[in-house]
Curated annotation (Swiss-Prot):
Protein name as it appears in the record: Small ribosomal subunit protein bS21
Family: Belongs to the bacterial ribosomal protein bS21 family.
GO molecular function, one term: structural constituent of ribosome
Coiled-coil spans in chain: none
Length: 57
């Protein structure tokens, strides 16, 4: 879990930027988007193979 404390004389905007950066480093937002709706394992495998095919060409 990302935790960001506001430092002395730091603006809220700067703290928010640090928080967002820490979330993106952890991959939290991507994980939330991925798990928002259930995806059957067969669909997940199909998407994975399509992505690999796109990378190949």
């Amino acid at each position: 879990m990302a935790e960001t404390r506001v430092r002395k004389n730091e603006s809220i905007d700067a703290a928010l930027r640090r928080f967002k950066r820490s979330l993106s480093k952890e991959g939290t937002l991507a994980e939330v988007r991925k798990r928002k709706h259930y995806e059957k394992p067969s669909v997940r495998r199909k998407k994975k193979s399509e992505a690999a095919r796109k990378r190949k060409f």
